[in-house]
Amino acid sequence: MANPIVGRVWKFGDDINTDAIIPGKYLRTRDMQIFGTHAMEGIDPEFTKKAKPGDIIVAGTNFGCGSSREQAPLALKHSGIACIVAKSFARIFFRNAINIGLPLMEADVECQEGDEIKVDLFKGEVLVPEKGIFKGNKLPDFLLDILNDGGLVAHRKKVKGEHK
């Protein structure tokens, strides 16, 4: 996992539902690229045409609420989103994102869509040029380890290999 994560901002509001992140009609596929090409389609059908790899989502409260589908963070990850910063996350979305290796941070950040920001997960800070540093909730070390290893499955394989 790269740290800090530097990327262009896409802004979203409160209560962004998993059904809006990846509509249910795409849930039967196992092709991750299909998930990626339909990310955020329920809110902005053109999102994946505009977003670029390395971009960052900044959102309000309760990001990822709704049904507990792992496909929602997978869709964002496979669309190229490098990180999500939100005032708060639905708990199941938060853990699903960690489990698949999608970095995120809870922070109240003042920025505009299109701004380039720097997210430092190890410090729990977001730097917005000309606006300053916004303190967020630093992830515990064990969650940073999971993200660093690329997600829970990769982390377990690494840990298991270290204990042989």
UniProtKB/Swiss-Prot annotation:
SUPFAM superfamilies: LeuD/IlvD-like. The record marks R28 as: Critical for substrate specificity. A motif (YLRT) lies at residues 26-29. Pfam families: Aconitase_C (PF00694). InterPro entries: Aconitase/3IPM_dehydase_swvl, AconitaseA/IPMdHydase_ssu_swvl, IPMI_Swivel, LeuD, LeuD_type2/HacB/DmdB. Keywords: Lyase. One of its GO terms (molecular function) is homoaconitate hydratase activity. It is an enzyme of class 4 (lyase). It catalyses: (2R)-homocitrate = (2R,3S)-homoisocitrate; (2R)-homocitrate = cis-homoaconitate + H2O; (2R,3S)-homoisocitrate = cis-homoaconitate + H2O; cis-(homo)2aconitate + H2O = (2R,3S)-iso(homo)2citrate. Its EC number is 4.2.1.114. Component of a hydro-lyase with broad substrate specificity for cis-unsaturated tricarboxylic acids. Catalyzes both the reversible dehydration of (R)-homocitrate ((R)-2-hydroxybutane-1,2,4-tricarboxylate) to produce cis-homoaconitate ((Z)-but-1-ene-1,2,4-tricarboxylate), and its hydration to homoisocitrate ((1R,2S)-1-hydroxybutane-1,2,4-tricarboxylate). Is also able to hydrate the analogous longer chain substrates cis-homo(2)-aconitate, cis-homo(3)-aconitate. These reactions are part of the biosynthesis pathway of coenzyme B. This is Methanogen homoaconitase small subunit 2. The gene is hacB2.
